[in-house]
């Protein structure tokens, strides 16, 4: 019964957010600030899942005007956990098929996010090449999930290099954002599903990297994030 009630409430809330967010974003058509505002609306739904989410955002975060944020992509619960961490004037890059999701697809487009056609390597490469130009010309940041797909409990998957190429080309830092593990953590028939921690890590300077050693940068970021996720999981397990 609790599961059905939660599903009903979440569906109603998500539809309302999509409708209101679409109207709001049409008024401010593709304004880069739209994404962060709507993402935080979704990010406030976590109590409906019996979760307590701690958001760790550095005090000086607002001083960083342009960056590429990379997050770990676990499952659909990312919408109510790590989505809250999207910063002002940050747009995300998502697969083209998102446009076909009822209500959400039009919202994703009108807020100003960027679609990536993974089926067409040429178009995908061109999209990534344009990111560097947009970051500097429009004074915005980009949010990406470098795993390219939800890992669904398989640990942090190998990173694709698109985000790192874009950061090097634009000359902006990479900022990892991590969320503690949610795989098999949430039981919709259970009132209390525990705690989740989301954290923005320190910026990573990319000035010492080129396209020739971009995979070294990706591997370095992967190792940092993997280690930090394990530390957050351990912290939660200890009850802190």
Curated annotation (Swiss-Prot):
First-level EC class: transferase
Catalyzed reactions: a 1-acyl-sn-glycero-3-phosphate + an acyl-CoA = a 1,2-diacyl-sn-glycero-3-phosphate + CoA
Pfam families, per database record: Acyltransferase
Keyword Lipid metabolism in record: yes
GO cellular component: plasma membrane
Keyword ATP-binding: no
Any GO molecular function: 1-acylglycerol-3-phosphate O-acyltransferase activity
CDD domains the UniProt entry points to: LPLAT_AGPAT-like
Keywords: Acyltransferase, Cell inner membrane, Cell membrane, Lipid biosynthesis, Lipid metabolism, Membrane, Phospholipid biosynthesis, Phospholipid metabolism, Transferase
Subcellular location: Cell inner membrane
Highest rank taxon of the organism: Bacteria
Chain ranges for the short sequence motif HXXXXD motif as given in the UniProt record: 73-78
Free-text comment on this protein's domains from its UniProt entry: The HXXXXD motif is essential for acyltransferase activity and may constitute the binding site for the phosphate moiety of the glycerol-3-phosphate.
Descriptive protein name: 1-acyl-sn-glycerol-3-phosphate acyltransferase
Lineage of the species this protein comes from: Bacteria, Pseudomonadati, Pseudomonadota, Gammaproteobacteria, Pasteurellales
